[in-house]
């Protein structure tokens, strides 16, 4: 894989191993060998297969795997969910555990819905509770104090269910953008609440400690406050917690109550998941999409991610146990926007959403075929009995033979409780020099200021080629494009180029959502997606 100047700087700063003086003692090939050989666990055939997989750039695992495989930490997962119990001991146990996870490069999600509301009686002290929002500040301060593995600051997700008595305070707790800067916050939305919004009815707020209704409030007022705050500064988000649990693969183990910080990975309390993403843009070869290569990359990637579970050293025994009982992995994609540029398909088109669904169905289907094969060789995940799979349930309907797959899982088992997740891929897509996740490109051209006041132009290579092919490329033109990052108002550029080379702000929110829905149909977990609005929205 060709490593760009930007990618090399990121790798040197955050990924390559260093000596006691902070000097890099690795290059790209060294890192690939370190990671591949460690995950393969001494298997020579696998080591070579994993070297080829990573070095080609077809697949990259999440950052903690690249950073920590083969070193003393050996903490390889990106996503964690921790329980927060309704006691001082339980709360500060979670603070400590989150600090350990952040130190090793992971992100944490929490539900604060178990904590009793503000001013609720605390019998042991004959005092009153300060409520969940006050403890958010404690978690936030602890995150500030622990810089992740010396490489990146920790990230958190806080969820409070919509029927918690402190929900109004929670919805507005980030109105000041300087508050809780290490947290994304989301309201846990239920079907009952949405029905009350639809019917313009009141709904009950219930004390998690006593189970008593503390008051009833208008659902529309709460919903409108969520919308108002989200419009003001992007928070809170909403998490459809009932819907998440409708698709919980192991309901017999417990309910999922939170996600990771970016929202694409719902997990049980004390559970973690390791993710990895395939670069779709590299699969456009000689003016056609290489489906055979994609199939092989899927098989090798599932193998790799399953081995990551075996090689991980988790910071807590409880996490190690839950992870190995469910063996969840999250295989996703990056380079989607660049693939569409190569194929000359507009992102905001039916052709693109149909291709998205076809691609993701193929990936999801073959990831499960490989997981079935691994189950035949090494056994199903231990919580298979009682899971949706043991009951012949698989929420899929598409062009491929899902009935056959469903029957195979019932009879042969499956190695992993989930196989697919679409992550944001912010840093690994930069390393791979491709577009992130399933997002459109943010800008076609941008200017970077370097030393001595020099300015460097960075032009999307697919756009650059299209402009050269049309005989329109010039540095002056690229500087003009860099002013907005978009070409939609530039009449000198032919319409057929403008239609294909759209950027995130050229695409209406409706098309962003259609694209997300097309991928989500064939994803076990969720899709991390940004919906861009105009400044006037």
Give residue ranges: language-model regions.
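Acidic/polar, glycine-rich intrinsically disordered N-terminal extensions of enzymes
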Residues: 1-76, 82, 223-225, 232
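Core structural elements
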Residues: 3-11, 53-69, 162, 300-311, ...
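Active-site cavity-forming subdomains of large catalytic enzyme subunits
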Residues: 77-291, 314, 318-321, 367, ...
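A structural-propensity feature for long, helix-poor, extended segments
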Residues: 117-156, 285-313, 368-372, 451-498, ...
């Amino acid at each position: 894989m060709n490593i760009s100047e930007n990618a090399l700087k990121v790798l040197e700063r955050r990924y390559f191993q260093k000596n006691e003086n902070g000097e890099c003692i690795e290059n790209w090939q060294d890192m690939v060998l370190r990671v591949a050989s460690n995950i393969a666990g001494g298997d020579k055939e696998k080591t070579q297969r994993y070297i080829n997989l990573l070095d080609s750039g077809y697949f990259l695992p999440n950052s903690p795997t690249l950073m920590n495989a083969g070193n003393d930490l050996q903490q390889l997962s990106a996503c964690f969910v921790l329980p927060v119990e309704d006691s001082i001991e339980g709360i500060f146990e979670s603070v400590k555990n989150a600090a350990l996870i952040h130190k090793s490069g992971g992100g944490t999600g929490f539900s604060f819905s178990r904590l009793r509301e503000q001013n609720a009686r605390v019998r042991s002290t004959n005092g009153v509770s300060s409520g969940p929002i006050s403890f958010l500040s404690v978690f936030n301060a602890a995150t500030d104090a622990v810089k992740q593995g010396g490489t990146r600051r920790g990230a958190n997700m806080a969820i409070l269910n919509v029927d918690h008595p402190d929900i109004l305070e929670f919805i507005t707790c980030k109105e000041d953008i300087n508050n809780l800067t290490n947290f994304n916050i989301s309201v846990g939305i239920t079907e009952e609440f949405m029905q009350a919004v639809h019917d313009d009815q009141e709904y009950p707020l219930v004390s998690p400690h006593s189970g008593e209704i503390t008051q009833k409030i208008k659902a529309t007022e709460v919903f409108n406050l969520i919308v108002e705050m989200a419009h003001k500064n992007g928070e809170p988000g909403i998490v459809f917690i009932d819907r998440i649990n409708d698709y919980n693969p192991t309901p017999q183990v417990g309910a999922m109550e939170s996600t990771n910080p970016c929202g694409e990975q719902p997990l049980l309390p004390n559970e973690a998941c390791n993710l990895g993403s395939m670069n779709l843009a590299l699969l456009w070869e000689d003016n056609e999409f290489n489906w055979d290569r994609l199939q092989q990359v899927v098989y090798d990637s599932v193998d790799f991610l399953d081995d990551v579970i075996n090689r991980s050293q988790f910071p807590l025994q409880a996490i190690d146990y839950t992870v190995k009982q469910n063996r969840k992995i999250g295989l996703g994609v990056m380079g989607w926007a660049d693939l569409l540029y190569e194929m000359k398909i507009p992102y905001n088109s039916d052709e693109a959403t149909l291709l998205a669904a076809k691609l993701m169905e193929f990936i999801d289907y073959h990831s499960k075929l490989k997981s079935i094969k691994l189950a035949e060789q090494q056994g199903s995940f231990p919580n298979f009995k009682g899971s949706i799979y043991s009951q012949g349930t698989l929420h899929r309907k598409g062009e491929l033979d899902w009935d056959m797959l469903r029957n195979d899982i019932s009879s042969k088992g499956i190695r992993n409780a989930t196989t697919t997740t679409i992550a944001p891929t912010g840093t690994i897509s930069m390393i791979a020099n491709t577009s992130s996740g399933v997002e459109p490109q943010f800008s076609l051209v941008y200017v970077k200021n370097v030393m001595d006041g020099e300015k460097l132009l960075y032009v999307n290579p697919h756009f650059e080629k299209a402009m050269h092919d049309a005989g329109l490329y010039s540095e002056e033109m690229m500087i003009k494009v860099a002013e907005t990052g978009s070409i939609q108002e530039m009449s000198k550029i032919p319409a057929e180029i403008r239609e294909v080379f759209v950027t995130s702000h050229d695409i209406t929110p409706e098309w962003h959502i259609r694209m997300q829905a097309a991928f989500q149909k064939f994803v076990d977990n969720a899709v991390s997606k940004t919906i861009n609005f105009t400044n006037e929205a």
